[in-house]
Amino acid sequence: MKTLYSLRRFYHVETLFNGTLALAGRDQETTGFAWWAGNARLINLSGKLLGAHVAHAGLIVFWAGAMNLFEVAHFVPEKPMYEQGLILLPHLATLGWGVGPGGEVIDTFPYFVSGVLHLISSAVLGFGGIYHALLGPETLEESFPFFGYVWKDRNKMTTILGIHLILLGIGAFLLVLKALDFGGVYDTWAPGGGDVRKIANLTLSPSLIFGYLLKSPFGGEGWIVSVDDLEDLIGGHVWLGSICILGGIWHILTKPFAWARRAFVWSGEAYLSYSLGALSIFGFTACCFVWFNNTAYPSEFYGPTGPEASQAQAFTFLVRDQRLGANVGSAQGPTGLGKYLMRSPTGEVIFGGETMRFWDLRAPWLEPLRGPNGLDLNRLKKDIQPWQERRSAEYMTHAPLGSLNSVGGVATEINAVNYVSPRSWLATSHFVLGFFFFIGHLWHAGRARAAAAGFEKGIDRDFEPVLSMTPLN
C-alpha cells in the first residue's frame, strides 16, 4: 500500500484494520486517513465536509425535537418539573412559554409546538446533509466560490469567523426580543413567588454590565454567575449581541494583521483546537451558572441550588420551632453559636448551624425577610408568608444531590425525595464535557503546532507488529 509523501508529511497516517473497507469512496490511500478517522477524510473536500456538518446539525435538532415531545408525553402537571427528570421543558418554561404565576404550568401546547418545529427542521437538515454528503459537489471552490475555502487562506477564514459571530449576535438578540416584546420571560423574583413578565428597563450601563466580569469568582462576589436580576441579564445580551455583530462585521471587512498572522497556526486542525478551547470555557462557565444561579435557571423548574436547599432546611425548622415557642433570636446551638440565627463575619444576621457556610445565598422566597443588616428578627416573627413556608419545605426535601444510579436527596433528611435534580445533571454534564473538550483542545493544538513546525511524522509503521498479522477479513 503506497501512501503519498505529501500525506505522510502533513497528516499522521493510521494503519488500516481492514484495507478493503472504504466508506463513501473515501479510503486511506486517497485521504491519508482510515475510515474510523471520520471527517478527517474530508479535510480537503469542502462539499463533503459541508454535508457532514449539516447532517450533524440535523441529528442535534432531531434529538431536541424527539426528546422535547418525549418529555411532553410524560409530563405530569401536578408535579414540579424538577421531580420528573425533565431537562428540556425547564428551558422552555424559563423563556416564559406555558407557565403562569409561581411557575405553574398552565399550557403544554407551546412545548408540543416546539418539539414538532424541531422535528420538521431536522428533516430539512437531514435531507441537506445526505444531499451534500452523497450527491453534491465534492468541493465548493469551483462551483460556489463564496462557500468554498482553503484552510490556509487567512482572509477567508476570518470572513467565516465574522459570519459565525454575526449569527451568534442575532441569537443573543432573539432572547432580547422575546423578553421585551414577545410575551416576556419567567422572572423568579416577581412579587409573590415568580411570574412571566416583559422586561422594560434594561440595564445598559457599561460599568454595571462589565463590572460583573471584573468581580471576584469567589464567595458572594461570584463573577458573572452572580447576576440576580433579569434587567441585567437581558441587558448583558444586548451588549453581547452588539459586540458579536460588530466584531463579525469587522472580521468580514478586514484582513488579519501581521501580528495575528504570526501568532496563530492557520490550518484546519488549529481551528478545531481553538473551537474546542472556546467550547471548554463555555462548558465550565455553564456548569457554574446552572449550579449556583437561580435567576437564569429558576428553582421552580430546575429545583433549588445546593445552598438554597440548605438554607431552606434552616428556615423550615426555624418556622417550626418558633411556632413551638422557641426564642429563635437567642437560642444557643451545641457549639455555643446561635442555633437558628447568628452573625456573619461582616456582621449581618444569618441562619445558624451548618448552613452558615451558605450565608451569601440570595433567593426570592428569603429576600423579603431581610433588613439592612441581614435577616430581620421582627420580620421572621411576624411577616413569614405561607408561600415562603411551602416553598422552603419543598426545596429542603429536594436538594440537588444525587448519583448516576438516581439515588438522590440528602442522606440525613428523612423526608427527602429520591430523585436526581436537573441541576445535578446539567452541572455535571457540562463540567465533564468542558473537561473533555479541554483535553481535545490540547490534543489538536499539539498536533497542529507539530504539523506547522514540520515534525509531525506519527509512529514509524515499518516494524509495527500488526503489519505481520493476518488481515481481519
UniProtKB/Swiss-Prot annotation:
Lineage: superkingdom: Eukaryota
Cofactor: how and how many bound: Binds multiple chlorophylls and provides some of the ligands for the Ca-4Mn-5O cluster of the oxygen-evolving complex. It may also provide a ligand for a Cl- that is required for oxygen evolution. PSII binds additional chlorophylls, carotenoids and specific lipids.
Transmembrane segments: 69-93, 134-155, 178-200, 255-275, 291-312, 447-471
GO biological process: photosynthetic electron transport in photosystem II
Modified residues (N-acetylthreonine): T15
Propeptide: 1-14
GO MF annotations in UniProt: chlorophyll binding; electron transporter, transferring electrons within the cyclic electron transport pathway of photosynthesis activity; metal ion binding
Sorted UniProt keywords: Acetylation, Chlorophyll, Chromophore, Manganese, Membrane, Metal-binding, Phosphoprotein, Photosynthesis, Photosystem II, Plastid, Transmembrane, Transmembrane helix
Binding site for [CaMn4O5] cluster: E367
Location of Phosphothreonine modifications: T15
Its membrane topology: Multi-pass membrane protein
Cystine residue pairs: none
Gene Ontology cellular component terms for the protein in this record: photosystem II; plastid membrane; thylakoid membrane
Subcellular location: Plastid membrane
Keyword Membrane set for record: yes
Any Pfam family hit: PSII
Entry similarity comment: Belongs to the PsbB/PsbC family. PsbC subfamily.
Complexes and interactors: PSII is composed of 1 copy each of membrane proteins PsbA, PsbB, PsbC, PsbD, PsbE, PsbF, PsbH, PsbI, PsbJ, PsbK, PsbL, PsbM, PsbT, PsbX, PsbY, PsbZ, Psb30/Ycf12, at least 3 peripheral proteins of the oxygen-evolving complex and a large number of cofactors. It forms dimeric complexes.
HAMAP family (alphabetical): PSII_PsbC_CP43
Job of this protein: One of the components of the core complex of photosystem II (PSII). It binds chlorophyll and helps catalyze the primary light-induced photochemical processes of PSII. PSII is a light-driven water:plastoquinone oxidoreductase, using light energy to abstract electrons from H(2)O, generating O(2) and a proton gradient subsequently used for ATP formation.
The protein, known as: Photosystem II CP43 reaction center protein
Organism of provenance: Cuscuta reflexa
Phylogenetic lineage: Eukaryota, Viridiplantae, Streptophyta, Embryophyta, Tracheophyta
